[in-house]
């Protein structure tokens, strides 16, 4: 599907509402057992931790790696030291599938993130039943709808999920803090234009709070880029660079750069 420049998020959300209308109501089960992602990053603060993403395609890049065996890719991520695996489940724009999340969650021991544009409780129930232990809520999706964001955030926590709350600017970061979010992402990609500026992560660091952990998302391909955010961020989310890597283990380990923390 073609998207007009500047209309990325608007177009995706319109399609998402159609998808949800057809989505069946599911009786929610129990969240899969694994370690707590927040605690893990707090306890492993000497290195920048990596959320490794399984992503076949994207609106900005088109096809990335359509032939990938998603389970093998996820297992390789786990063996190479990823702290969590992010799984794209949007079928239209990212060529993802909820079944990918099911298959990966059944074959790894570490946390899995349902990466999608979540705007409804039906999606959260589905994520739990597919094996996710963390979901993504994007502040930009809930423009002028803070009560809805708060409701979905609290609902996810009540089920035993962790929530990665994604922000892009200072105003959205303040909303994440207002929510009481413990895991906060800073997306270097503007979801309205899809442009990526790594400096975006750096610019927001003066507003960070000590109790939360912070993840820099998008635009990180090398150890040098990882190093730029390593002192103030606890982790990074990386998809394209790992999906295209010819030496996945080395690529992932190179991204886990040393951090300067209060302890070292």
From Swiss-Prot:
GO term, biological process aspect, one: L-tryptophan biosynthetic process
Keyword Amino-acid biosynthesis listed: yes
Record InterPro entries: Aldolase_TIM, Indole-3-glycerol_P_synth, Indole-3-glycerol_P_synth_dom, Indole-3-GlycerolPSynthase_CS, RibuloseP-bd_barrel
Domain of life: Bacteria
Pathway(s): Amino-acid biosynthesis; L-tryptophan biosynthesis; L-tryptophan from chorismate: step 4/5
UniProt key word Amino-acid biosynthesis: yes
EC number: 4.1.1.48
Reactions catalysed: 1-(2-carboxyphenylamino)-1-deoxy-D-ribulose 5-phosphate + H(+) = (1S,2R)-1-C-(indol-3-yl)glycerol 3-phosphate + CO2 + H2O
Record-level Gene Ontology MF annotations: indole-3-glycerol-phosphate synthase activity; phosphoribosylanthranilate isomerase activity
Keywords: Amino-acid biosynthesis, Aromatic amino acid biosynthesis, Decarboxylase, Lyase, Tryptophan biosynthesis
HAMAP family per record: IGPS_B (MF_00134_B)
NCBIfam families hit by this protein: PRK00278.1-3
Family of the protein in this entry: Belongs to the TrpC family.
Name of this chain's protein: Indole-3-glycerol phosphate synthase
Encoding gene (name): trpC
């Amino acid at each position: 599907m073609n998207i007009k420049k500047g209309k990325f998020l608007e177009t995706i959300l319109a399609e998402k509402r159609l998808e949800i209308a057809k989505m069946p109501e599911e009786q929610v089960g129990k969240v899969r057992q694994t370690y707590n992602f927040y605690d893990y990053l707090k306890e492993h603060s000497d290195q920048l931790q990596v959320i490794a993403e399984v992503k076949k395609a994207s609106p900005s890049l088109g096809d990335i790696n359509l032939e990938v065996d998603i389970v093998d890719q996820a297992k390789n991520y786990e063996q190479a030291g990823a702290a969590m695996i992010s799984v794209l489940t949007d079928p239209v724009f990212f060529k993802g599938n909820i079944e990918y999340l099911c298959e990966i969650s059944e074959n790894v021991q570490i946390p899995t993130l349902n990466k999608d544009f979540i705007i409804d409780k039906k999606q959260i129930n589905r994520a739990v039943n597919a094996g996710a232990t963390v979901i993504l809520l994007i502040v930009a999706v809930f423009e002028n709808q803070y009560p809805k964001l708060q409701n979905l955030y609290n609902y996810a926590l009540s089920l035993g999920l962790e929530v990665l709350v994604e922000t892009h600017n200072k105003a959205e970061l303040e909303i994440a803090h207002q929510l009481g979010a413990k895991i906060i992402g800073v997306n270097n990609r503007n979801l309205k234009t899809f442009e990526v500026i790594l400096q975006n992560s750096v610019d927001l660091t003066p507003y960070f709070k000590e109790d939360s952990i912070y993840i820099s998302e998008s635009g990180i391909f090398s150890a040098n880029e990882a190093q730029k955010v390593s002192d103030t961020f606890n982790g990074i989310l990386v998809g394209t660079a790992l999906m295209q890597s010819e030496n996945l283990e080395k690529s992932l380990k190179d991204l886990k750069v040393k951090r300067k923390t209060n302890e070292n």
